[in-house]
């Protein structure tokens, strides 16, 4: 998901963009996607299972790192390969249920780099659609976007894929791999400590 603070902005209410507030009441537009890397993770787990069958020790960080970095060596058009990563429905694109699908023609460049690149691009596809609504239709301007979550654990890869998708620079903190749980912990700490300060 991508959340943008709307300081002094007015925005039309849209059913595809979640309007929420921060603990201090600031308005935030949130592009929330239900799928992101869920389908990609399923494929990575398939590679993990194959590696286990060969009797090779499995280190998930190494598997992700090698596959993600290898994706960057693929064709920029993913060799024609297309991934529809919908494990579940997606409100931003109006789909009630998901059915993941991988599509290629006989003439496409079907190799591991293009396969992984197609899945990485698919993982941010809904974020791109939602952000196009904010940036192009609503004319929202942003100062910075910070990426977080498992997609950003492999240095530079998720950052580069998302930056290309939404045509914006992406910053990533050292704790980026902690994802939503990190943010939830910070929010919980804020709520607890803020209550103590008010009492």
Outline where the language-model segments fall:
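Active-site core segments that coordinate phosphate-bearing ligands/cofactors
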Residues: 3, 9-146, 151-199
């Amino acid at each position: 998901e991508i959340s943008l603070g709307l300081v002094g902005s007015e925005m039309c209410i849209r059913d595809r963009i979640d309007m929420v507030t921060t603990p201090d009441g600031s308005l935030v537009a949130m592009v929330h996607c239900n799928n992101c890397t869920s389908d990609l993770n399923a494929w990575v787990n398939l590679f993990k299972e194959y590696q286990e069958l060969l009797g090779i020790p499995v280190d998930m960080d190494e598997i992700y790192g090698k596959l993600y970095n290898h994706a960057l060596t693929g064709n920029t058009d993913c060799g024609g390969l297309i991934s529809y990563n919908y494990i579940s429905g997606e409100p931003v694109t109006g789909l009630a249920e998901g059915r993941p699908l991988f599509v290629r023609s006989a003439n496409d460049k079907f190799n591991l780099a293009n396969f992984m690149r197609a899945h990485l691009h698919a993982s941010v596809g809904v974020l791109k659609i939602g952000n196009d609504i904010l940036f192009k239709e609503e004319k929202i301007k942003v100062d910075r976007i910070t990426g977080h979550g498992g997609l950003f654990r492999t240095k530079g890869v998720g950052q580069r894929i998302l930056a290309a998708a939404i045509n914006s620079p992406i910053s990533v903190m050292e704790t980026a791999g902690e994802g939503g749980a990190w943010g939830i912990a910070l929010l919980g700490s804020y709520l607890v400590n803020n209550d103590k300060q008010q009492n």
